[in-house]
């Protein structure tokens, strides 16, 4: 709440040339909120309204005033939608798999990985991210864990975040030496004994059919990741377009419009 009030207050003070939050009038607050309605989600807009509402105390220009709720014009993410699985569905699918495939399913969901990227998982210190890209500092905002990297389409190496407890389980499956595997005509160095590629995808589909009665393929966990991250970022008051850009990079793309494909 304090962060939201600071952000809103600074923007209003700069726009109207006032020096104190106490000078913010109801008209200034309403104007600010209406302007924000086109760029942030409903939860973020409600947070800023509640923050500004704190200024209705004695001694403030907004004393006794109640700010009405304003509806956002920005894109709202309905979760889950399209090909996305819910977290409970992912858990059910993983519970029906053998341990090496179950861990792969959980990691793919937690980090938004493609099936072949599971082969390429490495600690970031051993496989640095591609340096020719400008990576957003907002990646993984609001989440904690251990940074790994994977090699995606076009050879792009990107950072991914894996929850610490999951990373500990992954490290327990580290191979003494990497093995070379071939999948769909491409050779990979694999450093962990976890499921990946076509074999993991087949295991995922079979487990999904047994547990939830349907599947959208393993790529659905990337859709779930994208939708979860958009919801998290918008709830943290990231503007819609900025959230699209952040999630795009987390998925290994650099086009915000690609993220919207995962939201359908």
Model-derived features with residue positions:
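Catalytic-site neighborhood detector that most strongly recognizes the C-terminal catalytic loop/helix
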Residues: 249-264
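Flexible interdomain linker/hinge and immediately adjacent N-terminus
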Residues: 30, 61-91
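Conserved tyrosine-mediated DNA breakage-rejoining catalytic core shared by Y-recombinases
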Residues: 121-169
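Basic, Lys/Arg- and aromatic-enriched nucleic-acid-binding interface segment
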Residues: 87-116, 241
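Non-catalytic DNA-binding core/recognition domains of DNA-processing enzymes
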Residues: 1-63
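Short basic/aromatic active-site micro-motif
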Residues: 201, 213-234, 240-249, 253
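Active-site/catalytic core of tyrosine-dependent DNA strand-transfer enzymes
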Residues: 161-227
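The alpha-helix within a helix-turn-helix
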Residues: 108, 119, 247-249
